[in-house]
A protein has these predicted regions:
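A short, proline-enriched helix->beta-strand linker immediately N-terminal to the Walker B motif
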Residues: 54-58
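Helix N-cap at the start of a conserved alpha-helix in ABC-type nucleotide-binding domains
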Residues: 71-73
């Protein structure tokens, strides 16, 4: 509740209500009295998202939101980020190396190489680009090589 105490003029009751609402939104309503060490990695990620959205931000910044998670939990986190982005009408910026996440929730993709913008486009445009840095990074995965070939054959 620290951010609410610092930046919002709300009563204790209103703050508790807001925290409970946000915890319910990220499916952690029964975990509000647990210590961080008692939470799984996926639960800790959801707590981080809850802490970020409790203040109704205009922007949500996520740094490697799926790192250290199993594939199923990573998909749950991606879905949660997408739902919250849509529901709260906020701009979300995600820094990730996970191309599955990029393709699932990225509207606009900016590819950085050595800290410099190397390419910008949509998830569909990723499959069409000839940008060497993007092709090398994205298609290091056999799955994405197959997806690209299927996409290019489909658009002929």
């Amino acid at each position: 509740m620290f951010p609410l105490k610092m930046f919002k003029k709300q009563s204790q009751e209103e703050m508790i209500e807001r925290v409970n609402f946000v915890l319910k939104r990220v499916n952690l309503e029964n975990s509000n009295f647990k210590f961080p060490a008692e939470l799984s990695g996926g639960m800790q990620k959801r707590v981080a998202i809850a802490r970020a959205i409790v203040m109704n931000p205009k922007y949500l910044f996520c740094d490697e939101p799926n790192s250290g998670l199993d594939p199923n939990t990573a998909i749950l986190i991606d879905n949660l980020i997408q739902e919250i982005t849509d529901e709260y009408q906020i701009t979300t910026v995600i820094n990730t190396h996970d191309m599955n996440s990029v393709m699932q929730i990225g509207d606009k993709i900016v590819f950085l190489k050595d800290g410099v913008k190397a390419w910008e486009g949509t998830s569909k445009e990723v499959f069409k680009t000839d940008n060497e840095a993007v092709v090398k990074f994205v298609y290091s995965s056999e799955l994405f090589k197959k997806v690209r070939l299927a996409y290019l054959n489909e658009t002929k």
